[in-house]
Amino acid sequence: YSIGDYRIFSPLLYPNTYAALMIAFFFVTSYLTVTTEHRVYRFFSSFLVIPALLSLILTYSRAGYLIFVILYLLILFVMPFIKQLQYLVMSVLAAVMTLGIYPFISRIGIRQQTDFQFGSYLLGWLILLVASALYMIVSVYLVPRFDKLLEERLTHRSFRSYARYIIPVASILMVILGAIALTNEHLIRLLPDPLENRLGNINLRQHSVLERITFYKDGFRIIEDYPLTGAGGGAWNSLYEEYQSNPYVTKDPHSYYLNHAIETGMVGLILLLAFLAFVYIRFIRNRVSDPGYPYRFVFFVFASSILLHSLVDFNMEFLYVSGFVFLCLGIMSSRTTEAVPEVKHKGKHKPQRSLFKLAYLGSMSILAVIILFFAARSVYANKLFTHTIEELNETIPADEALNTFYRILDMKPNHPHYLLGTISLLQAFYDYSQDETFLDHAQHYIDRLKTVDGHFIGIPEFEINNYIKKADIQGAADVSMYWLQRFPWNLTMYESTITLLHQLGMQQYQMNEDPVRWDQAIELYETMKRQVAKIEALPDEQLPGREFTITDTVAHIIADIYYYRGDYTKTISVLEQHVAPLDMS
């Protein structure tokens, strides 16, 4: 369970992705329950239906619930009428049984987080296993008889041609009525409290919806600057702080397709959509002619569940999820064919196809060895870096650590984190020895890091510190202002930049020069006020993200500037607006 809201998750460590997997798992098992002819397959698949549905409910994923309904309707449309009827009946039965045991399982699970009791733990499993076993018995022994009965009664009915649309259309109407029912406070109060809380506030003003809309708008702004081939792998994580509309923190735009467009541009997105269209069109065309279609339908269900949910989440960012999805797509695009008798070639000469196979196998083997070499080199560099950081100043002397970092950079000269670690250690050496050679070396690696990844968030702090350590306050201020244009929501950088500008302005003031640096400090203060106004203009339901406000440090500096300029009214105004009065009690 996640802390606070008790949303169940898995080693994936994300409830929404777990919900997507449970959606796929439910549809696969429930589909096999009503379609497979093998009793053993039906035995195992039916036993897993209720655990999958219960797990989905316990994720409390609103997007997951919505995708579940959409996929359920789509699956109904592609099934024949008799299977639709069976699927509907067995799904309703699974839903009723799951909702029946849900309150007990939920209460036991929540209580176990604070007061683990082995008896309650066993009771929870017993309830789940009994419900699953009952559902399995119904599926294994009653569904085949129900199937034969329906075949006998409905085979000769005249409405058979259009009957397959009756249940899906009726289900759509039921979904609409259910959605309307969720707007009724009296009806929704009949649900258990956790479900009531999650379903009761489904609307476009809900914070997760508003935040996603903000992510998508900012994502499209990135695409505008990198329209064709995109900004490269990991682009969102590197760029979003430069484009964000408010100081939120997220490593993903919460949409697989948007993230793909950001990284690979419109060319990459079009190729992805074309590939998906090819697979799905080929799969649909094989429906009649492919004898293995019913088995491939399972992979269609799984891939569609994840891909549809990925419209509003980042499930595909997990390597094992995306790998399995593309495996499903590969199976969907294939088809079962009859075995072709092998033609034996006579004579001493090997067929040309065999030579091609050998050449292909050899080239792929060489490529695999090369990739394995570079991968092993990268893994070794990472382990060496991690070990050095952990043992620094404990078992490894600082000078030895620096030499190790140089070795790591020889292996991976353009890795941002390795460069940043080396810069940090060089600056620490300067603090100890006051030898500016270390700062020059640090600046060399800073320049390299800016060339390799100019958007890396760790650069500004170390570059500014390098100038400050050299006592180049003017250079530090100029660099700070440059980076503030790139990262307009970095509160710490605003404070440090305004502090530097105040120092430079004071030097100009004492030398009877025009303190233009104070003007720049006031401009940054006005920029901060505009940023604060943007946050205040956000809907009440939307979370603003990181704290961004006019701090006491900034307020005192700006008030000090106005004081030296003789503008006492603004001095008092700034302090009254942003500095809390002292508690004299």
Range-by-range predicted roles:
Residues 1, 175-225:
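Aromatic-rich transmembrane-lumenal/periplasmic boundary elements in polytopic membrane proteins
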Residues 1-6, 10-183, 262-291, 295-298, ...:
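Alpha-helical transmembrane segments of multi-pass inner-membrane proteins
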Residues 14, 204-206, 210-250, 257-260, ...:
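TM-adjacent membrane-interface loops and short helices in multi-pass inner/ER membrane proteins
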Residues 24, 47-48, 193, 213, ...:
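Amphipathic alpha-helical repeat elements characteristic of tetratricopeptide repeat
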Residues 117, 148-158, 335-359:
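Flexible interhelical linker loops that connect adjacent transmembrane helices
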Residues 177-194, 352-396:
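Hydrophobic alpha-helical transmembrane segments in integral membrane proteins
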Residues 314-343:
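N-terminal intrinsically disordered, acidic low-complexity segments at the extreme N-terminus
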Residues 386-585:
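C-terminal luminal/periplasmic domains and tails of membrane-associated envelope-modifying transferases
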